[in-house]
């Protein structure tokens, strides 16, 4: 084997030329103690609050408690692989996640890493999980509707783009189902090319079973909703710090749409579990406990998250981010600490009741306790016209139904009120994963409030509605199109609806 001296000297010369004299300096500390997902670290004197740190085995953490002689950090992973004396280094970055349209259709964990086995994420940019919410000047009042596809919501508790509407109720009352139906209902709007009508969806699953999240993703895929949705999952088996972080990760992804003139919708399912995870972290970090052992800043935990949902004005791109936080109550107790906090932060609440659910009223919305503080400004003119009287009639029905239990001899007007109320309640029922387009909701509610259902037996209302809407689609598609395009109920449309209803009532048996 011949050795060429010239070649060797050239290689050595190239290596010398490309030799970098600057050393890589990183500030390091040592683990003093570790346990329960918390590490106490000596050193790291210049670390920032909320900064990402890296342990020697590659596991990431976040510095939260900056004390005189040590740093308290939470660990985003298993603490069993970290031991006393391990070296920890600063990364110099505050926790950030990938954002952009490249995330649509993907399932990620609380740090934005893909967990769906579809390869790496193509992200246009990264964004900090903790940023300040928009101030007062960049905002605009809520005026565009979010069509949920649920008659009971769009008519009685309307949600506008940029609103925060709480979904609250006991376990197994259909809270997540309301949110998923809203996602599925965006399919037609998102299939078009008009960016102002599209609504990109983010679903944050906090502390749920993996099987539940898998079922959710399957449902969204089967209904064609996954292509415009992002799922952020911090499941029950994930460490508490990831369950605490996941909502902020989700809102950072949603803010990308809001800040770029698009519209986003985010669901936090559910914030009770995030508060529990934060309580666990705070107690282990030895922060002083308050009411129900939650830390003193648990209100700020949720307020700084929900304030990031906003409707921006024209100068800031006209985008919006709508939030539907979910809170689980215990035995219908809405006066507990976390429910009252979140009720006071949001712009209204949808209250779901176990009793209604078991009576077969689904979605199990208690119309009397549910309110939307800003949504009525976002309701379309057509829906306002038909839904104006339904609220009053249902309120009177609830009041009368309570009295009617005592007396059997009711006068004709009371009897009429009770009959109408029973049929309207029946009309607002809707099967899961079958959201209705806005124009069909208008036609359906129009039939109810104008007395066309009064002669129909209560148990036939659902059949009547299905038959009537099928008739409208096949023979009166132009009327539905007129309502959809104008978003108003003109005199011509009203007359056409009346004649169609009169004809259908005669043939219905």
UniProtKB/Swiss-Prot annotation:
Sorted alphabetically, the keyword list is: ATP synthesis, ATP-binding, Cell inner membrane, Cell membrane, CF(1), Hydrogen ion transport, Ion transport, Membrane, Nucleotide-binding, Translocase, Transport
Q: Which domain of life is it from?
A: Bacteria
A GO molecular function term, named singly, is: ADP binding
List the catalysed reactions.
ATP + H2O + 4 H(+)(in) = ADP + phosphate + 5 H(+)(out)
Database matches in Gene3D superfamilies: 2.40.30.20, ATP synthase alpha/beta chain, C-terminal domain, P-loop containing nucleotide triphosphate hydrolases
Membrane topology of the entry: Peripheral membrane protein
Q: What is its main location?
A: membrane
> Which Gene Ontology cellular component terms are annotated?
plasma membrane; proton-transporting ATP synthase complex
Quaternary data = F-type ATPases have 2 components, CF(1) - the catalytic core - and CF(0) - the membrane proton channel. CF(1) has five subunits: alpha(3), beta(3), gamma(1), delta(1), epsilon(1). CF(0) has three main subunits: a(1), b(2) and c(9-12). The alpha and beta chains form an alternating ring which encloses part of the gamma chain. CF(1) is attached to CF(0) by a central stalk formed by the gamma and epsilon chains, while a peripheral stalk is formed by the delta and b chains.
State the name under which the record lists this protein.
Answer: ATP synthase subunit alpha
Q: Give the protein family.
A: Belongs to the ATPase alpha/beta chains family.
Where in the cell? Cell inner membrane
Query: Native species of this protein?
Result: Rhizorhabdus wittichii (strain DSM 6014 / CCUG 31198 / JCM 15750 / NBRC 105917 / EY 4224 / RW1)
Does the record's keyword annotation contain Metal-binding? no
Record gene name:
atpA
Site description Required for activity, residues in chain: 370
Q: Give binding positions for ATP.
A: 169-176
According to its UniProt record, the EC number is 7.1.2.2
Presence of the UniProt keyword Ribosomal protein in the record: no
**What InterPro entries does this protein's entry cite?**
ATP_synth_asu-like_sf (IPR023366), ATP_synth_asu_C (IPR000793), ATP_synth_asu_C_sf (IPR038376), ATP_synth_F1_a_nt-bd_dom (IPR033732), ATP_synth_F1_asu (IPR005294), ATPase_a/bsu_AS (IPR020003), ATPase_F1/V1/A1_a/bsu_N (IPR004100), ATPase_F1/V1/A1_a/bsu_N_sf (IPR036121)
What job does this protein perform? Answer: Produces ATP from ADP in the presence of a proton gradient across the membrane. The alpha chain is a regulatory subunit.
